[in-house]
């Protein structure tokens, strides 16, 4: 469990080090952490990979559709492990 907590802290630090959502998404660490926008009804949400089973849901503060340059604040919504099987 400590590994997952450390990963969440690393993702939080990456977000804090990014000046806006665009810089976060362009950062190569975003690929390592699997930060990506959801599709369909959840397209307002971004997720980050905590491990093979657990995803962190992240929502930009602002109105959708987002201007990725203007978004400077994100909130952690929840941690989800129900759709990814054994991790």
What function would you assign to each model-found segment?
Residues 20-46:
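A short, surface-exposed loop/turn module that caps and links secondary-structure elements
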Residues 1-15:
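Arg/Lys-rich, positively charged N-terminal/basic patches that mediate binding to nucleic acids
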Residues 14-17, 21-24, 84-85:
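A generic signature of intrinsically disordered, low-complexity regions enriched in glycine/proline
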Residues 39, 46-87:
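Enriched for short, Lys/Arg-rich terminal
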Residues 15, 22, 43, 75-78:
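Compositionally biased amphipathic helical and low-complexity segments enriched in hydrophobic
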């Amino acid at each position: 469990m400590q590994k997952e907590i450390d990963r969440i802290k690393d993702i939080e630090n990456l977000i804090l080090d990014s000046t806006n959502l665009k810089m976060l998404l362009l950062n190569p660490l975003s690929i390592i952490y699997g930060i990506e926008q959801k599709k369909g009804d959840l397209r307002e949400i971004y997720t980050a990979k905590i491990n093979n089973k657990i995803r962190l849901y992240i929502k930009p503060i602002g109105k959708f559709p987002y201007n990725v340059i203007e978004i400077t604040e994100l909130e952690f919504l929840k941690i989800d492990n129900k759709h990814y099987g054994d991790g």
